[in-house]
Amino acid sequence: LTRVKELNDNGINVCFAQDSMSDPWYPLGNGNMMMILDHGIHIAQMMSPEEIVNDLDLVTTNGAITMNITDHYGIEEGKPANFIVLDAKSEFEAICERAGIVASVRNGEFLFRKVPAQVTGAIDLLK
């Protein structure tokens, strides 16, 4: 693996991506970028509290910069409303829990919505 942490720390744009989705070269691929992010930040050792809040950029904003599509990427007036909604309250929770997608929006229209998972019972492990 290249020196992702060092490149990122020095202001060089770094992004994570996946080009194989359940094919002969990578049968485990499923297009889940949270899995790719999880692997990448573990291997690159980018898990400090300061890094974690920015790690989502590695699979979102930084990819848009690399692909030179920032003129129509992001949540800003005048740009198409293309985004996903994760089942998490924070960046840390999204990464730690590999948050599921609860909605996907393209050009301002919902492609799908689903009810987030709910825990109906709990065990107090401290007893």
Q: What does each of the following model-derived ranges do?
A:
Residues E77-K127:
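C-terminal cap of metal-dependent C-N hydrolases
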Residues T2-V85:
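His/Asp/Glu-enriched, well-ordered alpha-helical/loop segment
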